[in-house]
């Protein structure tokens, strides 16, 4: 920074004025967004290798204008002029699946297998941005995922006059990455939010496992090299997605996959507000992520049996601790059950109100 500033001063340019020309990346600038940025900055400055993962939103939340004294929200088109700091990495693209149903079969060795069929899919393409450590030679990566259609345009449907069907795949992909926190007071909004969360989680976990396998043969030792830090409940579906990959793609048994997963996932909850402890309707979750729901259902069954064994007559405790209860999938409970480290970060004002 110092060298660049001195060079620009000699040329008669103001570095601060140049910095103001760069639009803020609309990737999440609320509390969790700032926290994630601080995590990456600190990890880089301390010399720890790390990846941060998220979605490459086209419009972020919104740009603010004041009209007649009132706030007016407009799309924040931060990518209008491109982003010179990002590098598109299509060679690391992966496929993310939604919907359909799960078919199971037993092979000749009596091992059960699960296959997702009749699904919709999108192509997750990573864009990498450098996160430079302070006064050292460490550069980590912020990997943000863009969604692209598997099939760009269906000419047959277009020729039949079904113009919406012709661009259905394109719209499915575009909607995932349009805005941060789409309105979820209706079913379509809830579905889109869950799609967003699973999209970037699935892409990121697939990427991490593939990177590990390039240099290591034994997937059972994944925890020796990889840790997934889950900030709040948004990425906690990581637990079930990692189980899916380990069992369905890498051939591990349930117990082997669970042993790896519970050593790889760490969870931090940054608020105890009810709206931040995400719950998803079971019918939505089951429809959109059928295999993931099956895995969560089995995690819940095993965990509830353990709770019943320890507290046989305490139905209230079982109801509070269960992952699936009252028609809801409780994501914080999932993360706590599966995480090898679970923390609650509470601000000082909250502590003073007697919550600890």
Question: Which residue ranges define each predicted feature?
Answer:
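Well-ordered mid-protein domain cores that form the structural environment of catalytic cofactors
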Residues: 2-41
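Glycine-rich phosphate/pyrophosphate-binding loops
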Residues: 40-64, 253-273
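Extended, well-ordered alpha-helical scaffold/bundle regions in very large, multi-domain proteins
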Residues: 239, 243-301
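Polar, glycine-rich mid-to-C-terminal structural blocks
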Residues: 280, 284-287, 291-340
């Amino acid at each position: 920074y110092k060298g660049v500033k001195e060079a620009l001063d000699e040329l008669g340019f103001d570095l601060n004025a140049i910095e103001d020309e760069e639009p803020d990346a609309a990737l999440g600038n609320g509390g969790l967004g700032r926290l994630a940025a601080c995590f990456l900055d600190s990890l880089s400055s301390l010399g720890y290798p790390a990846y941060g993962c998220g979605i490459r939103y086209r419009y972020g939340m919104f740009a603010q204008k004041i009209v007649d004294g009132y706030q007016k929200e407009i799309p924040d088109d931060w990518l209008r002029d491109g982003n010179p700091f990002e590098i598109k990495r299509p060679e690391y693209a992966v496929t993310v699946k939604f919907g359909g149903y799960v078919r199971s079969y037993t092979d000749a060795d009596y091992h059960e297998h699960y296959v997702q069929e009749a699904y919709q899919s999108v192509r997750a393409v990573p864009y990498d941005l450098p996160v430079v450590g302070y006064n050292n030679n460490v550069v980590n990566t912020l990997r943000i995922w863009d969604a692209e259609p598997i099939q760009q345009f269906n000419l047959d449907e277009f020729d039949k006059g079904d113009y919406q069907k012709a661009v259905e795949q394109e719209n499915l992909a575009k909607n995932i990455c349009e805005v941060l926190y789409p309105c979820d007071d209706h079913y379509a909004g809830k579905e889109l939010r869950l799609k967003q969360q699973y999209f970037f989680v699935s892409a990121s976990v697939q990427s991490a496992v593939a990177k590990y396998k390039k240099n290591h043969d034994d997937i059972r030792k994944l925890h020796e090299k990889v840790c997934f830090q889950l900030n709040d409940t948004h990425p906690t579906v990581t637990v079930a997605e990692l189980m899916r990959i380990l069992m369905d793609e890498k051939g591990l048994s349930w117990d082997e996959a669970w042993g790896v997963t519970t050593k790889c996932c760490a969870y931090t909850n940054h608020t105890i507000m009810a709206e931040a402890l995400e719950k998803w309707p079971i019918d939505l979750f089951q429809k959109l992520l059928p295999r993931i729901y099956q895995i969560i259902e089995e995690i819940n069954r095993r965990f509830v049996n353990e709770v019943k064994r320890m507290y046989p007559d305490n139905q209230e405790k079982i109801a509070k601790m269960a992952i699936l209860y009252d028609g809801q999938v409780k994501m914080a409970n999932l993360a706590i059950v599966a995480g090898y480290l679970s923390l609650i970060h509470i601000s000082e004002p909250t502590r003073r109100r007697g919550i600890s």
